[in-house]
């Protein structure tokens, strides 16, 4: 009979359930995720900081629907073709390397010389006056390079994190290891968000712009572009360096660690069949015919749509208070730090919820958290005048931003700590073919379809009513929010039954 565990052994099991012999594999995987999530946090802030101050928060729905979604479809086709031609390791290098090259090109070539590439403001204003219903499309055309950067930043999340990293992890770990490894991987990886926020705050901190001094002349605009370039280039250089480190770690894991006797059973999953010959149409058909994969896709769609619906009004409020790119980056840097701290805390809690309370309870917590915090934000915005009359001279705009930030932080913390882990565990019982090609289609297309569906609803309103803003359509967004939360919870209940059967 084994002796009872001491208090410190129990604490270690809660916070760090990784065995010593597993550290050789776990540490490089965790560092790799840290680098990838560092880039995710930095890129997420940069893309919003470029498009929201220059074109308005309403433009995000158009970017997600008309640029990001088609790009995801094209990339899925490209990924399937690459995976049929090369093994997974080389596909990883090709894809990540392509992203890093673009980020360098944008920071050092496109952005500093944008005046030479973008149309004249007088032409753009004239077109908007002539065609008011298409003003958002005209604005995208006026800042096309920002739109391109937005696409690549969005795809980093869908492709490098959701598809490449997690697919690699799913090949290596079985269900039992995943319960211990995934929450802790996420906990270590989310330190990358804290580091990303710190980098953003550091490089934007000495360039804060007074809103009253925003440029009204061409010379002032060029000067502001120069200051933003000085902030952007070192940040992008660090992003590229983190990407290169992640590729080196991936190489070490494949060539040195997975060949060890300790990990030989895991490595067989990766090396046994890295190339699955399957056409694009066959891949899509495979997903459509699998009800189980369809339920996973619905989870992702619900989350993406709900986040899109809540984030738009919040980012519109942030722009009102921080109208320049540099100020916006600085705010988002501080937001990233708080997000990272919250995510790490939730990861510690989430790892124990997942191991002790199981898949079903863990999968339900994210929609419950999102519903509570989302309703708080909508109620605050809808009744902001009534709330303001109760608190006198209180800064309502700042308060709205804080409430929205709390909603964003708590809902995404539960998403990163529990939703991602439970979603990835749902793939593990599947066959290698369905797990690989099905995941590719679900993660890339499914992730963006959810956000694009929310974007379609919003953009349709903005096209039909050119004068509409997030403030004027907030009540309709609340109704959609309640319907989608209910659908999400129903889908978790149904998926749990099938997942339990497959794991038997």
From Swiss-Prot:
Residue stretches spanning the membrane: 23-43, 59-79, 90-110, 146-166, 183-203, 230-250, 296-316, 329-349, 364-384, 386-406, 449-469, 473-493
Subcellular localization, as worded in the UniProt entry: Cell membrane
Major subcellular location class: membrane
Cellular component, GO annotation: plasma membrane
InterPro entries: ADP_ATP_car_bac_type (IPR004667)
GO molecular function, one term: ATP binding
Domain of life, source organism: Bacteria
Keywords recorded for this protein, A-Z: ATP-binding, Cell membrane, Membrane, Nucleotide-binding, Transmembrane, Transmembrane helix, Transport
Record membrane topology: Multi-pass membrane protein
Family annotation (NCBIfam families): AAA (TIGR00769)
Role: Provides the rickettsial cell with host ATP in exchange for rickettsial ADP. This is an obligate exchange system. This energy acquiring activity is an important component of rickettsial parasitism.
Family to which the UniProt record says this protein belongs: Belongs to the ADP/ATP translocase tlc family.
Protein name: ADP,ATP carrier protein 3
Organism of this sequence: Rickettsia bellii (strain RML369-C)
UniProt lineage: Bacteria, Pseudomonadati, Pseudomonadota, Alphaproteobacteria, Rickettsiales
């Amino acid at each position: 009979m084994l002796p009872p565990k001491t208090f410190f052994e129990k604490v270690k099991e809660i916070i760090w359930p990784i065995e010593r012999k597993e550290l050789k594999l776990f540490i490089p995987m965790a560092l790799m995720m840290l680098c990838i999530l560092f880039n995710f946090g930095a890129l997420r802030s940069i893309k919003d900081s470029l498009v929201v101050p220059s074109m308005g928060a309403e433009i995000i729905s158009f970017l997600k629907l008309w640029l990001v979604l088609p790009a995801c479809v094209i990339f899925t086709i490209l990924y399937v073709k690459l995976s049929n031609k090369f093994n997974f390791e080389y596909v990883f290098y090709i894809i990540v390397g392509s992203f890093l090259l673009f980020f360098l090109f944008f920071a050092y070539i496109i952005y500093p010389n944008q005046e030479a590439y973008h149309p004249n403001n007088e032409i753009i204003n004239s077109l908007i006056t002539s065609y008011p219903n298409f003003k958002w499309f005209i604005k995208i055309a006026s800042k096309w390079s920002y739109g391109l950067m937005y696409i690549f930043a969005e795809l980093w999340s869908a492709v490098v994190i959701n598809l490449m990293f997690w697919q690699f992890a799913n090949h290596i770990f079985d269900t039992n290891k995943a319960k211990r490894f995934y929450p802790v991987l996420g906990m270590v990886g989310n330190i990358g968000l804290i580091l990303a926020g710190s980098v953003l705050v550091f490089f934007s901190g000495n360039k804060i712009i007074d809103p009253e001094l925003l440029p009204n002349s061409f010379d002032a605009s060029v000067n502001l572009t120069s200051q933003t370039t000085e902030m952007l280039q070192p940040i992008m250089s660090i992003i590229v360096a983190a990407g290169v480190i992640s590729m080196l770690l991936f190489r070490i894991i494949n060539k040195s660690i997975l060949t060890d006797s300790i990990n030989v059973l895991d490595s067989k999953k990766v090396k046994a069949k890295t190339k699955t010959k399957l056409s694009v149409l066959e891949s899509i058909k495979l997903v459509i015919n699998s009800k189980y994969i369809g339920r996973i896709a619905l989870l992702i769609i619900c989350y993406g749509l709900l986040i899109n619906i809540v984030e738009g009004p919040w980012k519109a409020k942030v722009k009102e208070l921080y109208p320049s790119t540099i100020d916006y980056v600085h705010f988002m840097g501080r937001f990233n730090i708080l997000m990272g701290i919250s995510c790490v805390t939730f990861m510690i809690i989430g790892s124990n919820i997942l191991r002790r309370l199981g898949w079903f309870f863990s999968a339900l917590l994210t929609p419950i958290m999102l519903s509570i915090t989302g309703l708080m934000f909508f109620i605050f915005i809808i009744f902001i005048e009534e709330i303001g009359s109760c608190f006198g001279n209180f800064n309502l705009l700042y308060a709205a931003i804080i409430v929205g930030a709390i909603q964003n932080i708590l809902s995404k913390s539960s998403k990163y700590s529990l939703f991602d882990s439970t979603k990835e565990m749902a793939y593990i019982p599947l066959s290698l073919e369905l797990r690989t090609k099905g995941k590719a289609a679900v993660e890339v297309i499914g992730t963006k379809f959810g956000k694009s569906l929310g974007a379609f609803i919003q953009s349709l309103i903005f096209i039909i009513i050119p004068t509409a803003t997030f403030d004027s359509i907030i009540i309709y967004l609340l109704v959609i929010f309640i319907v989608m939360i209910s659908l999400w919870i129903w889908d978790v209940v149904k998926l749990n039954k099938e997942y339990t059967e497959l794991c038997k």
